[in-house]
């Protein structure tokens, strides 16, 4: 067991346009090589495209709903018992839920064909908003794995 104290959570300020802490965390996840201004440009451009395509007045509400649709509820964790390793289903902590959803959205947006990340991100957010696409499939696969290993749920720690 670690003798050190737990690291304190950093409080990040909201983003400059919408004042949302969640959106600022998303921008930080999109950022590569410390280029935050480029990440902001990509995310704000994607939000505008997203809101325009869906006819939303407030892009932030649509973004939060898309993120909510992508959040996993259960995941599997490896647990070694004796000589065997079991995939034990556990509930995902609230912070980790949003973190995983953001990572999946960004990963699938980057893997979309085409050069423009802004367009890929907007399309992935639209897919999440409509409960379809690669991110939602990843979430369903995670839930399916947890459901398949429900027999090992008593190995929780």
From Swiss-Prot:
Keyword tRNA-binding attached: yes
GO molecular function: rRNA binding; structural constituent of ribosome; tRNA binding
Highest rank taxon of the organism: Bacteria
Transmembrane portions of the chain: none
GO CC annotations, alphabetized: small ribosomal subunit
Keyword Membrane among UniProt keywords: no
Pfam family, one: Ribosomal_S7
Coiled-coil positions: none
Keyword list, A-Z: Ribonucleoprotein, Ribosomal protein, RNA-binding, rRNA-binding, tRNA-binding
SUPFAM superfamilies: Ribosomal protein S7
One BP annotation, GO: translation
Function: One of the primary rRNA binding proteins, it binds directly to 16S rRNA where it nucleates assembly of the head domain of the 30S subunit. Is located at the subunit interface close to the decoding center, probably blocks exit of the E-site tRNA.
HAMAP family according to UniProt: Ribosomal_uS7_B (MF_00480_B)
Assembly description: Part of the 30S ribosomal subunit. Contacts proteins S9 and S11.
Family membership noted in the UniProt record: Belongs to the universal ribosomal protein uS7 family.
Name by which UniProt lists this protein: Small ribosomal subunit protein uS7
Organism: Chlamydia trachomatis serovar L2 (strain ATCC VR-902B / DSM 19102 / 434/Bu)
